[in-house]
Amino acid sequence: MEAHMDRLSLTGALLVATPLLEDPNFYRSVVFVIDDTPDEGTLGVILNRPSELGVGEVLAEWGEHVSQPAVMFAGGPVGQDAGLALAVPDDGQRPLGWKSLDAMDAKTWPNGLGTVDLDTPPQLVADALRQMRVFAGYAGWSAGQLRAEIDQGAWYVLPATVDDVFCADPRGLWSRVLRRQGGELAFVATFPHDPTLN
């Protein structure tokens, strides 16, 4: 996948931080790419940063409709005062307030994946959703910025699964994603947080 990185869209892929990435915003992060266009840049959300704050404490009407753990996730360092929701609808459903993401692989996402307008009354959309997660903020890169970071060895670009986006144990996601790749990346999953303690 990385050989043609400059012309392939990364929408729907995972960005998994390599051990070289020491920025505290992204240390051992797993980012799901929501949108990637050559002219406008890239937008994604960090999947493995659950907060202690319940969704119901911030968005009272949505609290009972989100996947477990039912907490707000820190989606990234940009726009942290705004919520962004990802959801998978039930079979054949395209509810009001749900917008499909472009370029989603039908094998991985047979029901689709999209965003939910959190201003939509939950009673109009929630019953048609299979899974939903709410993020405060997002990760963003200007045009060409993410490709440069990938070339510098900051990110692994890997395929995403539904379980990655909606996993019940998000804190262990970085290691799980790397382990399932096998080979060298499975070895990277065993790196200690502080290599000097090894």
From Swiss-Prot:
<protein>
    <recommendedName>
        <fullName>UPF0301 protein Tfu_2389</fullName>
    </recommendedName>
</protein>
<dbReference type="Pfam" id="PF02622">
    <property type="entry name" value="DUF179"/>
</dbReference>
<dbReference type="GO" id="GO:0005829">
    <property type="term" value="C:cytosol"/>
</dbReference>
<dbReference type="InterPro" id="IPR003774">
    <property type="entry name" value="AlgH-like"/>
</dbReference>
<comment type="similarity">
    <text>Belongs to the UPF0301 (AlgH) family.</text>
</comment>
